[in-house]
Curated annotation (Swiss-Prot):
Protein name: D-alanine--D-alanine ligase
Localization per record: Cytoplasm
Biological processes annotated in GO: cell wall organization; peptidoglycan biosynthetic process; regulation of cell shape
Any GO molecular function: ATP binding
Residue spans crossing the bilayer: none
Assigned keywords, A-Z: ATP-binding, Cell shape, Cell wall biogenesis/degradation, Cytoplasm, Ligase, Magnesium, Manganese, Metal-binding, Nucleotide-binding, Peptidoglycan synthesis
Gene: ddl
Length: 300
């Protein structure tokens, strides 16, 4: 099978995507497929460079990658691809829409408000949410332009920074607890990982630098594990996920809260999904093979 590994892109997460793509290529080649690296520098590259491939493995992150646009182009070209479809990808990229659906489905998530300009910051609403808060681009990833703000004085500057990366900004209550991630493969949860960043929170450096954080497989207490698994599965169903996603949560006082869903989780050597799969004996090559197999089974 001729597999095109699509990477690069036009988002702020381009470098992360290129790293993911290189790792994916290295291990897909072990499976004896014909691998074609497809580096995207501008949107129209997808139409041109994807011609003639049998399958697209998406190693993209951020806008024009995780937001459903590339998925829509590939469906138009009748090229099967890895991961979730356009609708789920678009919703999960929009943190505000994701949280609205979670709230409607009675899935725990931290309180938040969204703003689209410095002028419409509602300081009273933020006070109700309670400080400290995270200020971040509504559709960003990899914690780019994400800041932990401890009082009213820091809000304006943090919003201005986030608005450089997106037209909308999320201001979300900081729920202090243990950060965990649940990797879902074909609707089943792999072992849970605890994320223990060496910084104050799991920022860009903690995510991608060697030694930026400790990520360890943990065995949760039985009742908590059941709650976490039920919540991860509820996210999968409510947001109509397919093939694989990563559900990030915070556990506070024994109660899990969903932070966000990643529809194209990172695939670098430091990435969480391969670590979780490895804990049940699934090698990186086997994981990639499963993603290809399950993706081909999805009716688009």
């Amino acid at each position: 099978m001729k597999i095109g590994v699509i990477m690069g892109g036009i988002s702020t997460e381009r470098e992360v995507s290129l790293n993911s793509g290189r790792e994916v290529i290295k291990y897909l080649e072990l499976l004896e497929h014909e691998i074609i690296p497809i580096i995207i520098d501008k949107k129209e590259d997808v139409m041109e460079k994807a011609k003639g491939i049998d399958f697209a493995f998406l190693a993209l992150h951020g806008k024009f990658g995780e937001d459903g646009t590339v998925q829509s182009v590939l469906q138009t070209l009748d090229i099967p691809y890895s991961g979730c479809g356009p609708l789920t990808s678009a919703i999960c990229m929009d943190k505000d829409m994701t949280k609205k659906i979670l709230k409607y489905a009675n899935i725990n998530t931290a309180d938040w408000v969204n703003v689209s300009s410095v002028e419409n910051i509602d300081y009273e609403a933020i006070e109700k949410i309670g400080y400290p808060v995270f200020v971040k681009p509504n559709s960003g990833g990899s914690s780019v332009a994400t800041n932990l703000v401890k009082d009213k004085e820091g809000i304006k500057e943090a919003v201005e920074l986030a608005l450089k990366y997106d037209k909308e900004v999320m201001i979300e209550n900081y729920t202090k607890g243990e950060e965990i991630t649940c990797c879902m493969l074909n609707g089943k949860m792999l072992p849970v990982l605890a994320i223990r960043p060496h910084a104050e929170f799991f920022d860009y450096t903690a995510k991608y630098a060697d030694g930026g954080s400790d990520e360890v497989v943990i065995e949760l207490e039985e009742n908590l594990h059941k709650k976490v698994e039920e919540m991860a599965l509820a996210c999968w169903k409510e947001l109509k996920c397919e093939v694989y996603v990563r559900v990030d949560m915070i556990v506070k006082d024994g109660i899990p809260y969903v932070l966000e869903l990643n529809t194209l989780p990172g695939m670098t050597k430091n990435s969480l999904f391969p670590k979780s799969a490895n804990a049940v004996g699934i090698s990186f090559a086997e994981l990639l093979n499963s993603i290809v197999k399950y993706s081909l089974e999805v009716e688009r």
